[in-house]
Structure formats: C-alpha cells, structure tokens
Curated annotation (Swiss-Prot):
GO terms for biological process: mRNA catabolic process. Residues 390-483 form the HD domain. Keywords: Cell membrane, Endonuclease, Hydrolase, Membrane, Nuclease, RNA-binding, Transmembrane, Transmembrane helix. This is Ribonuclease Y. Residues 264-327 form the KH domain. NCBIfam families: HDIG, PRK12705.1-1, RNase_Y. One of its GO terms (molecular function) is RNA binding. Its main location: membrane. It is a single-pass membrane protein. One of its GO terms (cellular component) is plasma membrane. InterPro entries: HD/PDEase_dom, HD_domain, HDIG_dom, KH_dom, KH_dom_type_1, KH_dom_type_1_sf, Ribonuclease_Y, RNase_Y_N.
Length: 574
C-alpha cells in the first residue's frame, strides 16, 4: 500500500466518523461520542502508524531498488563507456598507425627527394668546380702563351741584337786578323833583321840568337797577354756591372729587414725555485712525461728562477715552452695534465704556423698559395741558416726579386712568388731525405706552382744552368740577402777555420809574401814580392787565387781578392 492510499483511507475514516456522529448524535450521548471519537482516533493512529511503518518499509525498499537500479545503470554506463573508450582507443590507434605509416612514407619520399636534391647539388657543384678549374687552366694557358710570346719576342730581339754584335765582332776580328797578319809580317822581317844584325855584331850562333829572341818575345807576349786579360776583364766588368749595379742599388735601398739568430736553448722563467720540485714531480715522473711527449730536454740546474729547454728542433722547443708556461700558470702539474696541455700546445702551434705563413705571403705580396704550401711556409719561421731566419730571408728575397724584375720589365708578382718559395724545401728537410732544392722542387710541383717558380727553386744556387730569367733574379736576390753584413753568422770555430783557409790558399802561391783575411772573411789582401811578381802577373795571380777559393771552399756571399804590389826604392845621402 502506498502513502497516498493511506492518506485517502484516513480521510474516509474521518469523514465516516463525522457522519456517524451526526447520525447518532441525537440518540447517543456526548460521552459515547467522545469514546467513539477516541476509539476512531486510536484506530486512526494505529492505522497511521502502520501506514507509516509500511511507508518506511516501502521507502526503504524503494531506496534499495533505486540503489540497485543506480548501480545497474552505473555498471551499464561504465561498460558502455569502457566499450566506447575501447572503440575510441582502437580507432585512435588505427588512426595513429595510419598517420605514422603515412608520415613514414612521406619521410621516405622526402628523404629520397633530399638525396636526389643533394646528389643534384653535388653534381652541380662538381660541374661548377670543373668549370672553374677549366677556366683557371685556360686562363693559365693563355697567360703562359702570353708570357711565352713575350719571351720569344724578347729572345728574338736579343738574337737580332746578338747577330748584329756578332757581325760587328766578325768584322772586327777580320780587321784584327789583317792587323795581326801585318804585325806578324813586320815581326818576321824585324826578326830576320835582328837575326842578321846579331850574326854580324855579336857573332852569335843561330841557336843562341833564336833563344835570345824567343825569351824577349815571351816576355813581350806575357806582358801583352796580361794587359789584354786585364783590359777584357775591365770591359766586362764595366759593361756587365753598369746596369746591374744600378738595379741592385735601387733594390737594396728599397729593402731593409731585420735578421734573427736562432739558438738551440730556450730559457723559461718560473715564479720561484720551489716550483722546480713540482716540475720534476715524484721520482721524476713529471719531467719524464714532459720530455717523452715533447721530445725536448728539460734542464733544471742552479740557474735562479729559470729552467732551460734544449732541442735542435725549434718547433718542438716552442711547443714545449708554450706547454710549460701553461702548466706554470695553471699550477696543476701531473702526467695526465701534461699530456693534455702538450696536445693543446701542438694544436695552437699548427694555427700559429699557418698564421705566420699567411702573414709572410701578405708581406711579400704573393696571393693564391695553397693552404698546404702556406703551412710549409710558416714552418720556415722556426728554421735558420747561418743564424739568419729563413722565413724573413725568403720575404726579403721576394722583395728584392720583385724590385729587380720590375726594373727589367718582367712579371714582378711571379718573381716575388719564386723568391718567397725558393727555400721552401728547408721546411721539411729534417724529416724528408734529400737536399732542400730537391725537396722544394717536389713540393712546388705537387702544389701546382708555375714552371718559373720550379726553375727558380731548382737553380737558385747555380743560375748558369737556369732556363728562365726568374731563377737568375732569385739567385741574385738570395746572394744579396745572405751577403749583407750581419745577415748571417757562423760558429766561432768555423769562422776561424775559414779565415785560416783563406790565408793558407793565398800563401800557397809562389811570390806571395804574406796574406790577410779581413772584412770578416769577405776580403783577402795579398802582399806579393815585387821582384818576383810584376804588375801584369798581379792581375793573373788575383784571378788564380779567386778561382782556387771558389773550388776549395764553401762560404756565404762572395770573397774579394786584392793583390798589393809595392816597389820601394831606398837610397841614402851621405
């Protein structure tokens, strides 16, 4: 029974009671009415209480039923939601898989397209490089043809001038031949006349007369030969030196550079003598590791606040100096740290060498050098010859060769290039077998240098065999740079031995009284005995001494031979 039914029942009972009271009101008394009313109320309360209890039971059952329905609905909703979520996940996974597949396919297509594009770019780049190289080759060939044409034109002009000089010389020889024939006829007649007079006056035999005449002729011819040699040498000097002195003087006046003597020991200052123990390390492990990694002897002696680095390889010595200074600055000195710092110093040294090569090329006005050649050029900064820095010497030779080439109407840039690279073989002559000339030729050919540069490297010590004028210019510039006072130095022992050898060669000739090597071995003054050496023989003697010095000795620059003949006439007035 529902709550609405209970309420309706109570209303019906109430109305029934009221009607009953009205109907029996007249017959019954008020007491009975009250009793009936009270009974009706009790019954109504009982009914109401029962209705309430039933209503509570119904409500509780309804709640349980609603809860069960709610749980069932929630379970169905949860199941539906999980089913929907599973479906959504499945669809999402399928969509993601499809999208991933499409992305992979698109990535593969993009990668393939990129590879094709990269290959196309590489092909275009290679074609551009080939085109550039072909243009450079054609440009070089045109330049070579132009230079060859200029050389042929100059050679033709020189040949024409030489032919003209030869014709003049031939005519002069014909005239001299006629004059000599006439002189010979005159001498023959004079000889016959002298012979006849000798026979008549002296009563000499023909053999004795012939001997006297031959001795006289020998003396006259010897005097004439000496005079002609002296005159020819003077003419050659005047003609050959006049223009050369002008060019060399201009070049030397326009060029001035410093020189530097390279030692085999580097001094590194340290903060205090206490640092020497840290440098040595426990049981000498630090110093052994340092020497093994650098190849340089680390000398720690009683020198206050300094240590010495000794090595005949200047690059290794400089790397060791940089590494040691970094270790002293950092304060951490142990084998692993030493290895790290030495490797860092080696990398910095490579950069430093390349920068020195670039600076040298820039200072010499040479462009277009390959990076490998610039690196080799920078190594010359640490190379010395007779105490002269080879890189500075090469720069100076480049300037001198360029100046002289400009004066002669040649390619100054090419001359500077040849001068700068003429000693390039000295950069690796300690690591590679062969002379610095042979190594330099191989390097120049490997880096594609012009033929003139290769020829200058090959013949800068023997210009007589050179094929181009640039080799002659480089040889002259090399001699100028090396012959400057103070440019090069030798050890004291070699210096003294060279001076003694110069004096010994001069004293070995007959008629020489004494000899002095002066001007740091660049001049030999020879004092001869006047009664044994005539003025004519003095010139021949100077030439013979110079020739023997050239054959038997090695020396930088040139040596001047001066022969002094002094005749003294002494008489006393009594």
């Amino acid at each position: 029974m529902s709550l609405l039914d209970l309420v309706l029942l109570l209303l019906v009972l109430g109305l029934g009671g009221v009607l009953l009271l009205r109907r029996k009101g007249e017959d019954r008394s008020a007491q009975e009415a009250r009793e009936l009313l009270e009974a009706a109320r009790r019954e109504a309360r009982e009914v109401l209480e029962a209705a309430r209890k039933e209503a509570r039971d119904i409500l509780e059952a309804a709640r349980h039923e609603a809860k069960a329905l709610r749980q069932e609905a929630e379970a169905r909703a949860k199941a539906q939601r999980e089913e929907v979520e599973a479906e959504l996940r499945r669809r999402l996974e399928a969509a993601e898989a499809e999208a991933k597949k499409r992305l992979e396919e698109a990535g593969e297509r993009l990668k393939a397209e990129r590879e094709e594009l990269r290959a196309e770019r590489e092909r275009l780049r290679s074609l551009q490089e080939e085109l550039k190289e072909e243009r450079e080759r054609l440009k070089a060939e045109r330049e070579e043809l132009r230079r060859e044409g200029e050389r042929l034109a100059k050679r033709a002009e020189a040949l024409d001038a030489r032919a003209a000089r030869l014709e003049e010389a031939e005519a002069e020889l014909v005239r001299k031949e006629e004059a000599l024939k006439a002189e010979a006829r005159a001498l023959e007649e004079r000889f016959k006349e002298v012979e006849r007079r000798l026979y008549e006056v002296a009563g000499l035999t023909p053999e004795e007369a012939r001997r006297l005449v031959l001795e006289r002729l020998d003396r006259e011819l010897e005097e004439e030969k000496a005079q002609r040699v002296r005159a020819a040498l003077e003419r050659a000097r005047l003609e050959a030196r006049r223009e050369a002195q002008k060019i060399l003087a201009q070049a030397m006046q326009r060029q001035a550079s410093e020189t530097a003597a390279q030692l085999a020991v580097t001094v590194v200052p340290i903060p205090s003598d206490a640092m020497k123990g840290r440098i040595i390390g426990r049981e000498g492990r630090n110093i052994r590791a340092f020497e093994a990694l650098t190849g340089v002897d680390l000398i720690i002696d009683d020198t206050p606040d300094a240590v010495l680095l000794s090595s005949f390889n200047p690059i290794r010595r400089e790397i060791a100096r940089m590494a040691l200074e970094e270790l002293l600055k950092d304060g951490r000195i142990h084998p692993s740290r030493i290895e790290e710092v030495v490797e860092k110093a080696k990398q910095e040294m490579k950069t430093f060498i390349y920068e020195r090569g670039e600076e040298a090329a820039l200072e010499a006005g040479v462009v277009g050098l390959k990076p490998g050649l610039i690196q080799l050029l920078g190594r010359l900064h640490f190379r010395s010859s007779y105490g002269q820095n080879v890189l500075k010497h090469s720069i100076q030779v480049a300037h001198l060769a360029g100046i002289m080439a400009a004066e002669l109407g040649l390619d100054a840039a090419l001359a500077r290039r040849a001068g700068l690279l003429h000693d390039i073989g000295k950069s690796v002559d300690r690591e590679v077998e062969g002379s610095h000339v042979e190594i330099g030729i191989a390097l120049a050919r490997r880096f594609g240098e012009p033929m003139e540069v290769v020829d200058a490297i090959a013949h800068h010590h023997d210009p007589d065999n050179a094929e181009t004028l640039y080799a002659v210019l480089v040889a002259a510039a090399d001699a100028l740079s090396a012959a400057r006072p103070g440019a090069r130095r030798e050890s004291l022992e070699e210096y003294l031995q060279r001076l003694e050898a110069l004096e010994r060669i001069a004293l070995s000739f007959p008629g020489v009284e004494t000899a002095f090597a002066v001007q740091a071995g660049r001049e030999v003054r020879v004092i001869v005995k006047p009664e044994k050496i005539s003025d004519a023989k003095a010139t021949l003697l100077a030439r013979e001494i110079a020739s023997r010095i050239e054959k038997e000795m090695n020396y930088p620059g040139q040596v001047q031979v001066t022969v002094v003949r002094e005749t003294r006439a002494v008489e006393y007035a009594r």
